[in-house]
Amino acid sequence: MWIANSSSTSPVLAPFIYGTLERLLLPFGLHHMLTRIDTAGVSGISGVPWDAVELPSQFMENWCWEPEALAFISGHYETGEPLPKELLDKMLAAKNYQAALFILRQLEFGLFDFRLHAEFRPDQGAKILETLAEIKKLVAVVPSPSWGRFPHAFSHIFAGGYAAGYYSYLWADVLAADAFSRFEEEGIFNRETGQSFLDNILSRGGSEEPMDLFKRFRGREPQLDAMLEHYGIKG
């Protein structure tokens, strides 16, 4: 994938790195643009609980890895040929390399965030590193060095707006993968499936409970299977 090189005066092309495509689709804005809710406080992403606010953005990334979708948006800059299937398979394998460790790391972050906000008592002093060490014993594969001070740089839960909400990244991954699995079953460009996602997810903003909206779209509560399969982890 390529884009015009705006930093050059010559008519050359600059590579559109694959990660850039993911970043383009991640904050694509459909949740805001397609809202049908007139009340500002619950339209678009406004008023959407942390449990589901990342669902549409992570959902959109799935199209980056579908051959049928890539045929529309990719092409060799000289021949116009779409991305070869064998190259996509290699990219998928690279994406899923050590995916299980990534999931465990996200669980570690989420649990640490929860416990930090649920158990902190100013009069008893902060047990930040002790709390992290306890969590790592539960979920971490590789121990941290004794001099490690990761919590001091965990900006998401202090300055990033995700205090007691970091878990939503991984939970949104579950929701997004499970929602996309319906498209995999019915066709990634199936018009009726897309309309259902618009009617039940994108257009509703924060006007209803996310679980109710998800069940209307998927016909059931979320399941983990699709997310694990997307990461190449199959039982």
Predicted region positions:
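Cation-handling catalytic/transport regions enriched in His/Asp/Glu
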Residues: M1-G235
